[in-house]
Protein backbone atom coordinates (compact mmCIF):
# COMPACT_ATOMS: atom_id res chain seq x y z
CA UNK A 1 0.00 0.00 0.00
CA UNK A 2 0.97 3.61 -0.55
CA UNK A 3 1.35 4.28 3.18
CA UNK A 4 4.23 1.77 3.32
CA UNK A 5 6.63 4.46 2.11
CA UNK A 6 5.69 6.68 5.03
CA UNK A 7 6.38 4.04 7.65
CA UNK A 8 9.91 3.80 8.94
CA UNK A 9 11.10 0.23 9.16
CA UNK A 10 14.28 -0.51 11.07
CA UNK A 11 16.24 -3.45 9.74
CA UNK A 12 18.73 -5.25 11.96
CA UNK A 13 22.08 -5.75 10.25
CA UNK A 14 24.31 -8.76 9.98
CA UNK A 15 27.19 -10.28 8.05
CA UNK A 16 27.07 -13.32 5.77
CA UNK A 17 29.31 -14.94 3.18
CA UNK A 18 28.42 -16.52 -0.13
CA UNK A 19 31.35 -18.31 -1.79
CA UNK A 20 33.54 -16.63 0.85
CA UNK A 21 32.35 -13.21 -0.41
CA UNK A 22 31.46 -11.15 2.69
CA UNK A 23 28.26 -9.11 2.59
CA UNK A 24 26.72 -6.71 5.05
CA UNK A 25 23.01 -7.48 5.03
CA UNK A 26 19.82 -5.90 6.22
CA UNK A 27 17.83 -8.66 7.88
CA UNK A 28 14.13 -9.10 7.11
CA UNK A 29 12.98 -11.62 9.71
CA UNK A 30 9.57 -10.26 10.70
CA UNK A 31 6.41 -9.83 8.64
CA UNK A 32 6.72 -5.99 8.49
CA UNK A 33 10.37 -6.13 7.41
CA UNK A 34 9.71 -8.89 4.86
CA UNK A 35 6.80 -6.92 3.36
CA UNK A 36 8.89 -3.74 3.12
CA UNK A 37 12.03 -5.41 1.80
CA UNK A 38 14.15 -3.11 -0.35
CA UNK A 39 11.19 -1.03 -1.52
CA UNK A 40 12.01 2.64 -2.13
CA UNK A 41 15.79 2.23 -1.64
CA UNK A 42 17.77 3.95 -4.37
CA UNK A 43 20.71 1.58 -4.68
CA UNK A 44 22.49 -1.42 -3.22
CA UNK A 45 26.29 -1.66 -3.40
CA UNK A 46 27.81 -5.02 -4.40
CA UNK A 47 29.03 -5.61 -0.82
CA UNK A 48 25.53 -5.32 0.66
CA UNK A 49 22.26 -7.19 0.43
CA UNK A 50 19.01 -8.06 2.14
CA UNK A 51 18.59 -11.45 3.78
CA UNK A 52 15.03 -12.68 4.25
CA UNK A 53 14.91 -15.14 7.14
CA UNK A 54 11.91 -17.42 7.62
CA UNK A 55 11.02 -19.48 10.72
CA UNK A 56 10.65 -22.66 8.65
CA UNK A 57 11.31 -23.86 5.12
CA UNK A 58 8.70 -23.09 2.49
CA UNK A 59 8.01 -21.94 -1.07
CA UNK A 60 8.49 -18.24 -0.40
CA UNK A 61 8.02 -15.92 -3.36
CA UNK A 62 9.27 -12.39 -3.97
CA UNK A 63 8.11 -9.57 -6.19
CA UNK A 64 9.60 -6.26 -7.28
CA UNK A 65 6.82 -3.79 -6.41
CA UNK A 66 8.16 -0.28 -5.69
CA UNK A 67 11.75 -1.30 -6.43
CA UNK A 68 14.07 1.27 -7.98
CA UNK A 69 16.67 -1.04 -9.54
CA UNK A 70 17.04 -4.66 -10.77
CA UNK A 71 18.08 -7.45 -8.41
CA UNK A 72 19.54 -10.94 -8.35
CA UNK A 73 17.65 -13.26 -5.97
CA UNK A 74 19.10 -16.39 -4.39
CA UNK A 75 17.07 -18.88 -2.36
CA UNK A 76 18.89 -21.11 0.19
CA UNK A 77 17.78 -24.07 2.28
CA UNK A 78 18.32 -24.30 6.04
CA UNK A 79 21.84 -25.69 5.49
CA UNK A 80 22.85 -22.77 3.26
CA UNK A 81 22.71 -24.70 -0.03
CA UNK A 82 21.41 -22.84 -3.09
CA UNK A 83 17.89 -23.91 -4.07
CA UNK A 84 17.12 -21.39 -6.82
CA UNK A 85 18.68 -18.36 -8.53
CA UNK A 86 16.85 -15.62 -10.43
CA UNK A 87 19.11 -13.07 -12.15
CA UNK A 88 18.52 -9.49 -13.28
CA UNK A 89 14.91 -9.21 -12.09
CA UNK A 90 13.56 -5.82 -13.21
CA UNK A 91 11.60 -3.45 -10.97
CA UNK A 92 7.81 -3.50 -11.23
CA UNK A 93 6.79 0.11 -11.71
CA UNK A 94 3.02 0.16 -11.88
CA UNK A 95 0.44 2.06 -9.83
CA UNK A 96 -0.21 0.54 -6.41
CA UNK A 97 -3.88 0.06 -7.33
CA UNK A 98 -2.91 -2.62 -9.83
CA UNK A 99 -0.02 -4.11 -7.82
CA UNK A 100 -1.44 -7.57 -8.44
CA UNK A 101 -0.04 -7.14 -11.96
CA UNK A 102 3.53 -7.46 -10.64
CA UNK A 103 4.90 -10.96 -11.25
CA UNK A 104 6.00 -13.11 -8.31
CA UNK A 105 9.14 -15.21 -8.42
CA UNK A 106 8.86 -18.64 -6.80
CA UNK A 107 11.76 -21.03 -6.11
CA UNK A 108 11.93 -24.58 -7.43
CA UNK A 109 12.24 -25.95 -3.89
CA UNK A 110 11.65 -25.00 -0.27
CA UNK A 111 13.91 -22.32 1.21
CA UNK A 112 14.62 -20.83 4.63
CA UNK A 113 16.65 -17.84 3.41
CA UNK A 114 16.42 -15.54 0.41
CA UNK A 115 19.23 -13.15 -0.46
CA UNK A 116 18.55 -10.08 -2.59
CA UNK A 117 21.63 -8.46 -4.10
CA UNK A 118 22.15 -5.90 -6.83
CA UNK A 119 21.81 -7.22 -10.36
CA UNK A 120 25.10 -8.60 -11.67
CA UNK A 121 26.24 -10.01 -8.31
CA UNK A 122 25.56 -13.63 -9.33
CA UNK A 123 27.63 -13.27 -12.51
CA UNK A 124 30.41 -11.20 -10.94
CA UNK A 125 30.99 -13.67 -8.10
CA UNK A 126 30.13 -16.86 -10.01
CA UNK A 127 27.25 -17.85 -7.72
CA UNK A 128 25.92 -21.28 -8.74
CA UNK A 129 23.87 -24.17 -7.34
CA UNK A 130 27.12 -25.28 -5.65
CA UNK A 131 27.50 -22.01 -3.72
CA UNK A 132 26.99 -21.98 0.05
CA UNK A 133 25.51 -19.36 2.37
CA UNK A 134 27.50 -18.92 5.58
CA UNK A 135 25.91 -16.83 8.31
CA UNK A 136 28.51 -14.94 10.33
CA UNK A 137 26.16 -12.83 12.46
CA UNK A 138 22.47 -12.05 12.21
Label the model's feature ranges:
Residues 2-138:
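Compact, glycine-rich, soluble single-domain proteins
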